[in-house]
Each structure stands twice: as structure tokens, then as C-alpha cells.
Amino acid sequence: MRHKKAGRQFGRDTSSRRAMLRNLTANLITHERIETTDAKAKELRRVAERLITKATRLGKVAYTAHGELSPGDRARRLHAERLVGSYIPRWGVATDGKKVDIIAKVMIDLSKRFEGRPGGYTRIIKLGPRRGDCAQMSLIEFIDAPPVADAPAQAAEPVAAAEPATPATTAG
């Protein structure tokens, strides 16, 4: 029986499951929104919010320059950075191909953005079934993520009504 065993297994062993969640978390932090299955999104939300909470609990210490911090605050910040870094990789690649320091993004950008917010940093939007295997898909994003920059919608030109075809007469 699996009483009091939280979390999903995803049909994987522990190391594969952990690697999958590490990569999903790194991609969510790098791109600020990703599309994945419902179950993975729900599990990813637990992991990502815990990492962001570690940074936000530092307050201003998380995004203040190192030189301005007291030795005690430097130690607190270093400890939090190492806790976050023990779970996610240091570097990620953004859509434009630039390298992103993921830990710095959590400690500086996200902690400043969510300062004073008691959790609930992500939103899961259901997208419907995936074509092919009918898996339920979701979009997981940070709640104040910038909107998706779509191409401006162009008004469709009205199509001229086609003349009705005249029935061909058969000679006979």
C-alpha cells in the first residue's frame, strides 16, 4: 500500500524522475512558460514554488549586491543559492540562444518579482488533449509572465463569391 507517499512516479525510476523534474524546472524558470502534460505540470508546480520560496524568504538579501551585505546575510544568501543550485542546473539556454544564469534569475529576478507574495507563483492552464496519444496537456507559467508576443492579427480579405456553376448539358 502506498499510504502517505506524496508525488507521482510517472513510470520512471527515481533518478529519471528527478532528472525530468530538474529539466522541467530549469525550462520553466528560463522561458517563464512551458507546455507539458497535466500530471507533470502539477508536480512541477510543487518543485518550482519551493525553490522560489527559498529565495523570497531572504527578502532584500536575495537581490542586494554582495558588497553591501553583512557577513551573516552573505552566508544566508550563499546557503540559499546552494540549496537552489543543488536541484537545478546553473546555466540554461533561452529561446534566442543566449546563456541564462538560472540560479541568479531565481535569486534576483523572481525573488524581487514575488516579494511579499505568500506562494502561488505559478498558474496551470488546461489546453486539452494532445494529438497522437490524447494525453491531457497544460500550459504552466508564472502568474505575472509577460504576454506571448503573437504576430499582429491581420484582417482577412473577403473572398469574392464564386458564381454558381451551371450544369453541363449533355448532348444526346
Swiss-Prot record:
UniProt GO BP: translation
Protein name in UniProt: Large ribosomal subunit protein bL17
UniProt subunit comment: Part of the 50S ribosomal subunit. Contacts protein L32.
UniProt KW tRNA processing keyword: no
InterPro entries the record matches: Ribosomal_bL17, Ribosomal_bL17_sf
Region forming the signal peptide: none
Region entry Disordered, spans: 153-172
Keywords: Ribonucleoprotein, Ribosomal protein
Transmembrane segments: none
Database matches in SUPFAM superfamilies: Prokaryotic ribosomal protein L17
HAMAP family (alphabetical): Ribosomal_bL17
Example GO molecular function: structural constituent of ribosome
Gene: rplQ
NCBIfam families assigned to the protein according to its UniProt record, in alphabetical order: L17
Domain of life: Bacteria
Cellular component terms (Gene Ontology): large ribosomal subunit
Family, per entry: Belongs to the bacterial ribosomal protein bL17 family.
